[in-house]
Swiss-Prot record:
This is Venom metalloproteinase antarease-like TpachMP_A. GO terms for cellular component: extracellular region. SUPFAM superfamilies: Metalloproteases ('zincins'), catalytic domain (SSF55486). The lineage of its organism: Eukaryota, Metazoa, Ecdysozoa, Arthropoda, Chelicerata. Its EC number is 3.4.24.-. One of its GO terms (molecular function) is toxin activity. Its cofactor is Zn(2+). Zn(2+) binds at residues 161, 165, 171. Its main location: secreted. Inhibited by EDTA.
């Protein structure tokens, strides 16, 4: 029988790395975080396993330029959410070797704030993560970035949230438009206010996914384009 295993390669920006005493400490932290991600993904009830292939903590001298290239002009304390995803795609498309090549999802963890600044706006909309929708298994597209600015509150929820975007789900309350999946059920039937992970995350439901999210992920996983997450169970 086939098992569904989503394999991750995690990279951390130099500011994130600086919070730890060693590269091993970064890896240990991310490993604990992924236990939390697995617990949240389990609420989809789709028997999806998450597997951490490895972690590369960037340091000032080794950090690729795509991170600094993604800062919001005039607001350099922020990473531009749209730019970071675009620049990550380009970088890992050109550096498609090793763990980056093996991974189903490549995720960047940063400590800087992330935001979106629309033309004409002066206020930045702050967000916790950004990713390429429905792009698991799609080389050169299978990327996301998450903010984690606290040593104690491991942001497993943000990683799980962005993972599910990559696995074909919109936010609760949103239809399938923009998913790039013509026959996806979308999530318009599950109100944002129900408080699930892809919605407003309330006390009652904030640690689980809605039925709509489940159906969207199930749909993408039924397509040939998601074949990279299937493997022989004996592995």
């Amino acid at each position: 029988d086939d098992c569904i295993v989503v394999e991750y390669y995690i990279v951390t920006d130099s500011r994130f790395t600086q919070r730890f005493d060693s590269d091993q400490a970064v890896t240990d932290y991310v490993t604990v975080m992924f236990t939390g991600v697995q617990n949240l993904i389990d609420t989809l009830n789709l028997d999806i396993k998450v597997r951490l292939l490895g972690v590369t903590p960037y340091h000032k001298e080794s950090e690729p330029s795509f991170i600094d290239d993604s800062l919001l002009p005039g607001h350099e304390t922020y990473v531009d959410a749209r730019k970071i995803v675009r620049n990550m795609k380009f970088y890992f498309c050109n550096h498609n070797t090793g763990l980056a090549k093996s991974a189903d999802i490549i995720m960047l963890l940063i400590t800087r704030k992330m935001g979106v600044l629309d033309p004409g706006d002066t206020d930045i909309s702050e967000i916790a993560g950004a990713s390429s929708i429905s792009s698991v298994c799609q080389r050169c597209n299978n990327v996301g970035a998450c903010v984690d600015n606290s040593d104690y509150n491991e942001r497993a929820d943000t990683v799980a949230h962005e993972s599910v975007h990559l696995l074909g789900s919109p936010h609760d309350g949103e239809g399938p438009n923009g998913l790039g999946l013509p026959n996806s059920p979308g999530a318009a039937n599950c109100p944002d206010s129900d408080g699930y992970i892809m919605g407003t995350r309330n006390e009652q439901n904030g640690k689980k996914f809605s039925e709509c999210t489940k159906q969207c992920v199930k749909y993408l996983l039924s397509l040939p384009r998601a074949s990279c997450v299937y493997e022989n169970c004996s592995k």
